[in-house]
Amino acid sequence: MATLKEKLITPVAAGSTVPSNKITVVGVGQVGMACAISILGKGLCDELALVDVLEDKLKGEMMDLQHGSLFLQTHKIVADKDYAVTANSKIVVVTAGVRQQEGESRLNLVQRNVNVFKFIIPQIVKYSPNCTILVVSNPVDILTYVTWKLSGLPKHRVIGSGCNLDTARFRYLMAERLGIHPTSCHGWILGEHGDSSVAVWSGVNVAGVSLQELNPAMGTDKDSENWKEVHKQVVESAYEVIRLKGYTNWAIGLSVAELCETMLKNLYRVHSVSTLVKGTYGIENDVFLSLPCVLSASGLTSVINQKLKDDEVAQLKKSADTLWSIQKDLKDL
């Protein structure tokens, strides 16, 4: 007796069983789910996989997204705590990790995250040996280094979300002051994602007009318009949002989706992302910091050589030293 489906549908050819644009998100917390919904909203993948250790939360998030399938262009949404579900991913977004406890040192937090990553990263590489790993978990620059060491992947396929969000915040705040859209405000935040990031004031422009030429004191303490405050706001904005709502998730989710889009669509766009900077600007250790990088389907294709002023280079080097002082003491890498 033929089933309803057999009566309805006449097969013509076998469909493809291997996804062509699969993305995995590891960690279904606030950030992981913001990444997931932002990726789905852009219609970037034909399959989305979610992984976490919390099975009920994981299944609930998967079902909730599946119920929205009518409104999405992603044919398959799957989830499991078993990493086999991630097989054949083009991009794996890592948002998992432990949270910093009150009074906990950064080194201790990093070491606890290293212990988590020691389980996660080999599993990712086992099932998707050709993927690009995009690290989002904090402290992102150190954990990108950790991922690179644990994965054995070439450096162009291990990328940290880095200062892509800091740069977006910078351009938004600049745009607010000038009354124009952030896409028309050009400026870059480089270095460490966080407190010691570097604002490249010399390159800030609108329509090719250098703002520092119009206001030579821009970004310094002598500036009557106090543009330096904009960078200060960039650094403090995450703390402010966390103070108000307990965490940040939407902006980082949107930022990650943009990075995924650049890679999956092979767009060769330039983003401020965390990459191995050894050998640039006189940095001698294996540290990851954000520089303007060209991303494509093969990962991080090239780095733009920014003309930095001496004080900006000094800030970058200081960031590198800070990160290395923590990295050199990490165990089990």
From Swiss-Prot:
The active site is at H193. The keyword Protease does not apply. Its EC number is 1.1.1.27. It comes from the Eukaryota. GO terms for biological process: lactate metabolic process; pyruvate metabolic process. It holds the Pfam family Ldh_1_N. Substrate binds at R106, N138, R169, T248. GO terms for cellular component: cytosol; membrane raft; mitochondrial inner membrane; mitochondrion; oxidoreductase complex. The keyword ATP-binding does not apply. NAD(+) binds at residues 29-57, 99, 138. InterPro entries: L-lactate/malate_DH, L-lactate_DH, L-lactate_DH_AS, Lactate/malate_DH_C, Lactate/malate_DH_N, Lactate_DH/Glyco_Ohase_4_C, NAD(P)-bd_dom_sf. It is found in: Cytoplasm. GO terms for molecular function: identical protein binding; L-lactate dehydrogenase activity. It catalyses: (S)-lactate + NAD(+) = pyruvate + NADH + H(+). Keywords: Cytoplasm, NAD, Oxidoreductase. Its main location: cytoplasm. Pathway: Fermentation; pyruvate fermentation to lactate; (S)-lactate from pyruvate: step 1/1. Interconverts simultaneously and stereospecifically pyruvate and lactate with concomitant interconversion of NADH and NAD(+). Belongs to the LDH/MDH superfamily. LDH family. Homotetramer. This is L-lactate dehydrogenase B chain. It comes from Gallus gallus.
